[in-house]
């Protein structure tokens, strides 16, 4: 049983850039987990080769021009760990991947990672829920918010604000930015580094862009139907205000500025128009590393909380299911357990 406060994909999954990658630098265990995550998407893409919501057309990234430009160091690091990477001069990019304005790329060049891709999470979630239902699973979305039901020190299910109880042998907290507070209420500390994020999806347009772009001022990717999805940390920091009632106010000037940044890196600098805007918490644990596994302070309860939720989503569910079904800890999750915050 999945208990959700409203329709599926109404949280962080519905406003994610969902770039599938292990680009740049991170811990070795996190890199391995992300690569396993990308592998599962490749398997899915082979099973569904004609869909327009899961693509592996590569990723292109560059740094701002200046003394802090580290693109050469990043390239050397990626090569050293066997991560497929090509360092390109600005004028060489068009021959490798289309749709980018070479004039926007710093003179130090850009890295093209051909193995990267993107997924439209709401569509993926719909596909997975169809499989879930076919196997006898139930999605509950009309009972309000839920919390972990704890009796005699053990998680025995969930209870919603409507008073509905769902008893279970195991409970998984996979509620995005709400995980730390819900875990704390149940008795487990999980440090939280969640910022507010902003994602814009444009109206469809004809454009040759195929790769995911991660640039100094904007990240963007194609989306189904010819739209472009884009975000930037600075835009969320400057343009999103949390109201007293928990809703979000978005500054139109910042939206316009972000659209202009996106247009400036796209070939032909097309006019981009807003189709939808999403704002809300971007799930990031306090130390930046995923939190996946049993909450030892609350037997019977597990957590899945991570920044790279799209990239590792399929494999995280697989490995967590293994732990729940077998009672054995999976070695790939050894450094990601919730207990690490209680041990500090």
Where do the protein language model's features map onto the residues?
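Dinucleotide-binding Rossmann-like beta1-alpha1 core, especially the glycine-rich loop
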Residues: 18-96, 217-219, 246, 253
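Active-site lid/adjacent beta-loop-alpha segment flanking the redox-cofactor pocket in flavoenzymes
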Residues: 206-298
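C-terminal catalytic lobe of FAD-dependent flavoproteins
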Residues: 121, 263-344
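Mid-domain beta-loop-alpha active-site segment that forms a flexible
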Residues: 110-130, 176-178, 250-261, 305-306, ...
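Flavin (FAD/FMN) cofactor-binding and adjacent substrate-gating region
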Residues: 39, 63-135, 140-141, 147-154, ...
């Amino acid at each position: 049983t999945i208990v959700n406060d409203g329709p599926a994909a109404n949280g962080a999954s519905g406003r994610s850039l969902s770039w599938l990658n292990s680009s740049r630098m991170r811990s070795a265990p996190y890199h391995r987990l992300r690569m396993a995550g990308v592998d599962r998407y490749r398997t899915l893409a082979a099973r569904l080769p004609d869909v327009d919501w899961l693509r592996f057309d590569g990723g292109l990234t560059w740094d701002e021009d200046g003394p802090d430009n580290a693109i050469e160091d990043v390239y050397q690091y990626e090569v050293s760990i066997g991560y497929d990477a090509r360092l390109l001069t600005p004028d060489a990019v068009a021959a490798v991947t289309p749709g980018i304005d070479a004039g926007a790329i710093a003179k130090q060049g850009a890295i093209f990672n051909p193995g990267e891709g993107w997924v439209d999470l709401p569509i993926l979630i719909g596909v997975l829920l169809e499989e879930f239902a076919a196997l006898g699973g139930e999605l509950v979305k009309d009972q309000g918010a839920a919390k972990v039901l704890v009796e005699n020190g053990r998680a025995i299910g969930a209870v919603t604000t409507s008073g509905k109880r769902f008893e279970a042998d195991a409970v998984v907290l996979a509620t995005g930015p709400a995980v730390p507070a819900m875990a704390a209420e149940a008795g487990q500390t999980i440090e939280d580094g969640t910022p507010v994020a902003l994602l814009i999806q444009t109206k469809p347009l004809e454009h040759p862009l195929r790769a995911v772009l991660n640039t100094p001022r904007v990240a963007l990717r194609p989306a189904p139907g010819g739209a472009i999805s884009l975000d930037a940390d600075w835009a969320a920091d400057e343009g999103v205000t949390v109201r007293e009632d928990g809703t979000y106010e978005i500054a139109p000037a910042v939206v316009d500025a972000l659209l202009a940044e996106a247009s400036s890196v796209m070939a032909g600098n097309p006019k981009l128009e807003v189709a939808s805007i999403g704002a809300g918490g971007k799930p990031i644990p306090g130390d930046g590393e995923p939190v996946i596994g049993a909450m030892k302070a609350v037997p019977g309860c597990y957590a899945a909380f991570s920044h790279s939720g799209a990239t590792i989503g399929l494999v995280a569910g697989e490995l967590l299911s293994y732990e729940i079904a077998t009672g054995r800890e999976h070695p790939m999750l050894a450094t990601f357990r919730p207990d690490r915050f209680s041990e500090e």
